[in-house]
Amino acid sequence: MRILLAAAECAPMIKVGGMGDVVGSLPPSLIKLGHDVRVIIPGYGKLWNLLEISSEPVFRANTMGNEFSVYEAKHPIHNYIVYLVGHPTFDSGQIYGGEDEDWRFTFFASSTAEFSWNYWKPQVLHCHDWHTGMIPVWMHQDPEISTVFTIHNLKYQGPWRWKLEKMTWCPWYMHGDHTMAAAMLYADRVNAVSPTYADEIKTHEYGESLDGLLNYISGKLRGILNGIDLNEWDPNIDKVLPAQFNIKNLERRSENKIILQKEMGLEVNSKKYLLGMVSRLVDQKGVDLVLQVSKRLLAYTDSQIAILGTGDKYLESGLWQLALDYPGRFSVFLTYDDSLSRLIYGGSDAFLMPSRFEPCGISQLLAMRYGSIPIVRRVGGLVDTVLPHDPENNCGTGFCFDRFEPIDFYTALVRSWEAFRHKDSWKLLQIRAMSQEFSWQRSALEYELMYKDVCGIKEPSPDITEIEKFSYGQSADPSLKKI
C-alpha cells in the first residue's frame, strides 16, 4: 500500500512530544511489511540545515490564497522519504503557539490535501492530532484515498468552526465544533494511542467534552499502543551512557548513577535511592503531586530526586525552590537535554510518572528499557504497559496507584523505597522491566490491519498469532517471563 503520514512533528528532526516519536519510528516497521510509506511535515526553518533537501520543489500549488512548495528529503536515520511543505509561515521554526497557529496548521493541512490529490496519491492518508484534522474532511470527497486519524492528546482540539469557515471558505462545513471533532467525524478510522485511553476518552472524566461524539463513532474507534525504537534506545550500545549495560551486567548501572549524581549536583552515593523524571512540567504530568509529596518523602527517606524538563512557570518555580531547600538531595534542570535524559533513564533507580491522564506515554517504556522502575498512576497507556509489582508472586514491572491524590502517590513512593532496600528482589524487578517487548513491530501489524480494513483489501492479513508474538506486557525472552 501507499501510505502517507501527515503530522506536525517527526523525530528526531522535529520533536516536542510522543507524536514525533510515532511519526518518526512507525514508517520503518511498515516499510518492512512491504509498504511504500512516506511522511509530510511543515518545512520548519531549522530543517533546511538538518536535512539534505532537493534543490528544487517537487510540487508547487496555491491554496487558501497562498502559494506553497513541497520539497523532498530523506529521514536522517531510516532513509525513507520526507516531504516538507515550504511557506514563509514556517520559516521561524516555531512549532506550536503563536498568533497564527490556527491558520498555520490549517494551511499545512490544505497543502497536504492538494499535494495528495495532484502529486503523490496515497491509498491511506494517516493524520495525527488536530493539526491535520481538516484533511479527513477534504479527503472524504475522494473515494480513492482513505483516511486514518490518530488521537495523541484529546485535550488539544484546534480552531473552532467559525474560524475554520473563515480560513478555508468551506461554508458546508457544519459538523463538529472544531478541527478535532471534524477529523473524528470524517475520518474512515480513528485510533487512540493505547487501548485504555481509547476507552477512557468515551467517558465524561477524560472525554474533554467529546465523549458523546466518541461514543457515537465508537464503531470505527480503536486503541493501538505506541512502541519505541529498540535500536535507538538500547542501554547495551547507547554511547551517551558512561557505562553500557544489559540484564547480565546490571551492576554497571551504578557507574551511570554516580555520574548522574555528579552532573545534577546531588550527593554522590550509589546506595541512595534516586528517583528520576524527564517530562514537560505541566499539570497533565502530575508535577503538582511531585511538589506536594517531595518534602515529606525527603524527610522520611534517604531518597534523592532528579528532574529534567521545562513547562509552566509556577511549576518550574516550585521545583526550583525545592532544589534550594534540599541541596544535594533535590535537583532540577529547567531545560531539555537528550544526553542528560538518557543518563536519567540509565542511572536513576526509579522513574516518576504520576500523570493526571496519559494517552500512551513513552517515558515509562524507555525507563523500563533502561532498568529504571516506573512509579505511575494507573491511567491511559500506563495501565497497558506497567504491571503492578507483586513481591509475593515475584511479578510486575513497576509501582502503581489509582487516585490522583498526594497520599496515594506518596504511598506508592514509600512502597518502592522499601522494595529498593531488598537488593536481590529489586534486581529481579529490573530484569523483568528490561525484558518487556515494546518494539514498533506489533504496532505496525495492528496499523496494517486497520489500513487494509479501511481500504477494503481482502488479501490475507498477518495471522493474529503473529501479533500475539509481540504482545505487550510479555517478556522478550520467554525464559524470563516468571522471574
Swiss-Prot record:
Keywords: Glycogen biosynthesis, Glycosyltransferase, Transferase. Signal peptide: none annotated. GO terms for molecular function: alpha-1,4-glucan glucosyltransferase (ADP-glucose donor) activity; alpha-1,4-glucan glucosyltransferase (UDP-glucose donor) activity. It comes from the Bacteria. The keyword Transmembrane does not apply. Pfam families: Glyco_transf_5 (PF08323), Glycos_transf_1 (PF00534). One of its GO terms (biological process) is glycogen biosynthetic process. It is an enzyme of class 2 (transferase). SUPFAM superfamilies: UDP-Glycosyltransferase/glycogen phosphorylase (SSF53756). ADP-alpha-D-glucose binds at residue 15. Pathway: Glycan biosynthesis; glycogen biosynthesis. Its EC number is 2.4.1.21. It catalyses: [(1->4)-alpha-D-glucosyl](n) + ADP-alpha-D-glucose = [(1->4)-alpha-D-glucosyl](n+1) + ADP + H(+). HAMAP family: Glycogen_synth. Synthesizes alpha-1,4-glucan chains using ADP-glucose. Belongs to the glycosyltransferase 1 family. Bacterial/plant glycogen synthase subfamily. NCBIfam families: glgA (TIGR02095), PRK00654.1-3 (NF001900). This is Glycogen synthase. It comes from Prochlorococcus marinus (strain MIT 9515). The gene is glgA.
